[in-house]
Amino acid sequence: MTNKYRNQKVVTPHGTFDSKREYRRYQELMLLQRAGKISELRRQVKYELLPSQRLNGKCVERPLYYIADFVYTQDGETVVEDVKGYRDPASAGYAKYVIKRKLMLYRYGIRVREVG
C-alpha cells in the first residue's frame, strides 16, 4: 500500500513504518540506543501545537497536532526527528509540515531534526 507521499509502508515485527527510509532510520537509532549513545527512543510521538478552539461552549476548531517520527534523549536533550525523502517546497504537504515544524519551535522550544 502506498501513502500520500507514494512511499511503500513497511510492516515489521517492530511495527508499521511509513517508508523503508523510516524503518532504516529506526534500525540505526536502535543500534545507537543499544550502544548507549541515545536513550528513551520512542516512535510516533504526538505533540499538541494548538488546542481546540471553542466559541460559546462549542468546539469550532479541532486541535492541531504534530506527530514526530522519532523522539529520543541524547546528551540530556530531547531530540525530535522527522524522516524526509524528496522535499517539494511547492507541495501543500510540505507547506503544512513547515508550519508545524515552526510551531514546534515556538511552542516547545524544540527544533525538529530532518533526516533523509
Model-derived segments and their meaning:
Residues 1-116:
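Electrostatic, structured charged patches in enzyme active sites and in nucleic-acid/phosphate-binding
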